[in-house]
UniProtKB/Swiss-Prot annotation:
Matching InterPro entries: KH_dom, KH_dom-like_a/b, KH_dom_type_2, KH_sf_prok-type, Ribosomal_S3_C_sf, Ribosomal_uS3_bac-typ, Ribosomal_uS3_C, Ribosomal_uS3_CS
Subunit structure: Part of the 30S ribosomal subunit. Forms a tight complex with proteins S10 and S14.
The keyword Ribonucleoprotein is assigned to this record: yes
Residue ranges annotated for the KH type-2 domain, each copy included: 38-107
Listed name of the protein: Small ribosomal subunit protein uS3
Designated gene of the protein: rpsC
Taxonomy, superkingdom: Bacteria
Role, per record: Binds the lower part of the 30S subunit head. Binds mRNA in the 70S ribosome, positioning it for translation.
GO BP term, example: translation
Family assignment from sequence similarity: Belongs to the universal ribosomal protein uS3 family.
Key word RNA-binding present: yes
Gene Ontology MF terms in the entry: mRNA binding; rRNA binding; structural constituent of ribosome
GO cellular component, one term: cytosolic small ribosomal subunit
NCBIfam families: rpsC_bact
Length: 215
């Protein structure tokens, strides 16, 4: 039986970077649980900000650096920084450590796999046509520069009695090529008929080509 490898883990250390950048054998369990609490708190509290990624660094004991990548940074910052103050207070209560907070904007959320998946899931929850939502996401991503995109939804689609899987693919998607920059996102849509899973793969080109273009 064939097994699928996670696209991010497959490229980790080659074309993808670690989301938690620290090493500590003595306090590993404590730090790991702390990381999970931080991610969970930010995701739940600022879901409307379109949080794509959270990177956590621990340059030295007792210090934490948190970088939030989101589509709508204004939601997290708030008017005159009011929301950031609330976020800082919430994190201080949660981890009781000194920390540095950085907020980065996702320039093209249309080509961010997790944000695309969350947008489709949100539309499905609002009873929109899943096919229309998938086609719209594919069209927008390709127009914004994606080289290829695949979207897969599974569950009781349109309230069907039997769960099934449907997917659309546009462009190229070289999953087995390590140099290919592939973004992957997964989320779920909660409907009256049950949970519908949404998976998105977006191919953004080869890493070597992107570095040469940036240089």
């Amino acid at each position: 039986m064939g097994q699928k490898v996670h696209p991010y883990g497959f490229r980790l250390g080659i074309s993808k970077d670690w989301k938690a950048r620290w090493i500590n054998e003595k306090n590993y369990k404590e730090y790991l649980l702390e990381d999970l609490k931080i991610r969970d708190y930010i995701k739940k509290t600022y879901h409307s900000a379109g949080v794509s990624d959270i990177f956590i660094e621990r340059p030295e004991p007792g210090k934490v650096s948190i970088t939030i990548k989101c589509a709508r940074p204004g939601v997290i910052i708030g008017r005159k920084g009011s929301e950031v103050k609330k976020l800082r207070a919430g994190l201080e209560r949660l981890i009781n450590r000194k920390f540095q907070l950085n907020i980065e904007e996702v320039k093209t959320p249309e080509t961010d796999a997790l944000l695309v998946a969350e947008d489709i899931a949100s539309r499905i929850e609002k009873r929109a046509s899943y096919k229309r939502a998938m086609k719209r996401a594919i069209f927008t991503a390709m127009r914004k520069g994606a080289k290829g995109i695949k979207i897969m939804v599974s569950g009781r689609l349109n309230g069907a009695e039997i769960a099934r899987t449907e997917w659309y693919l546009e462009g190229r998607l070289p999953l087995q090529t390590l140099k290919s920059d592939i973004d992957y996102g997964y989320t779920t849509a909660l409907t009256k008929m049950g949970i519908i899973g949404v998976r998105v793969w977006i191919y953004k080109g080869d890493v070597a080509q992107k570095k040469a273009t940036e240089a």
